Amino acid sequence: VKSCFERYGYAPIETPAMENIETLTGKYGEEGDRLIFKILNSGDFLSKSKIDKKTTSKSLSVDIANKALRYDLTVPFARFVVNNQNDITFPFKRYQMQNVWRADRPQKGRFREFYQCDADVIGSKSLFNEIELIQLCDDIFSDLNIPNVEILINNRKILSAMIEMMSSTNIFNDFVIILDKLEKIGIENVKNELVKIGVQKDKLNILDSFLNIRDVNDLKALLNDSEIGNKGVAELDFIIKKIDKLSLKNSEVKFDISLARGLNYYTGSIFEVKSSDINIGSIAGGGRYDDLTSIFGLNDVSGVGISFGIDRIFLVMDELNLFPKNIDVSSQVLFLNFGEEEASYCLALLKQLRENNINSELYPTDDKIKKQMNYANKKRVQFVVMIGEDEIKSGELTIKDM
């Protein structure tokens, strides 16, 4: 993954595991905010808080926690860009490979701590960036030999037009969060939740009409004269037509009108990546954010990025038996230890092997040979080298192919 990022011209950065809590909250929606791991302040801050029966955990957390573990890599990246804007060459292409934390219930494909690999371009509104990220995604999964990858694509501007036709109130963020749960809770429950946030029942047929759309061009008739909706269609159409001419290796790009991505900061193209062979949810996802840096004081800086969930990708590779058989082999060669003189003789040979990029090690103590050989077997070492008194005298080695 790292080599593919660098092949596309992305440079690495890292950000702290902890962020000020106000940096993170309000960027992921109400549900996302609940999953942020808060860090208790040092000292007895609780004694200074006014606690009574009306005190809620939310109001109390303001007094006792002003730091949190990062929820994703995108929001800290936006802060990084603002803090370093005078030293950055725009458009700025960065990749970042670090852990993130979610206060979630652990289950298959869901983790409280997991590894994300992000690639973003910021400081450019060009849709060619979206096209490049789709190519990057295809190359990464091709390099990993993961077949039958689906890249689902939609545009937040189209979703904005949908909710404008269904409701006169500004409930877009709530609408996106509800629509994002369609696959999990089903269409009827989605409709029930939309009614709860103010959508009239006689407007729900508009949702049905949109969800029946399979082709981008068919959207135009439904959107009528919606300026923002038609702009979203034009952006989608541009990306899909360019991608169709590129002949992707392992991936297929599909338009999915129900794709919403529940994070508040997306404003344009959104995409989600799944394995057609393994039902584990998304293994990558991302989108366009036009004003994320503005919350930190830097306006009119658009960005787009994609995030790869490495832990889920590992699960897919494991289910499909894609890991090489020697993936957990740390040493190719093990020198057995017959005593101080023999071990000292091995050191120069070890140095030569390592200088030639051959992973090798010396067993540290002169334990029984059976114990040393068991060590080699458990570590799946390919070759064992035995140098005793006779081998030192003759200048020859005894090598066992394991």
Provide a role label for each language-model segment:
Residues 136-143, 157-166:
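Hydrophobic mid-domain F-helix/FG-region of cytochrome P450s
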Residues 111-117, 153-161:
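Short, conserved phosphate-binding/catalytic loop or strand-edge motifs used
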Residues 32-48, 168-190, 275-276:
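Acidic, His- and aromatic-enriched active-site or binding-groove loops in soluble protein domains
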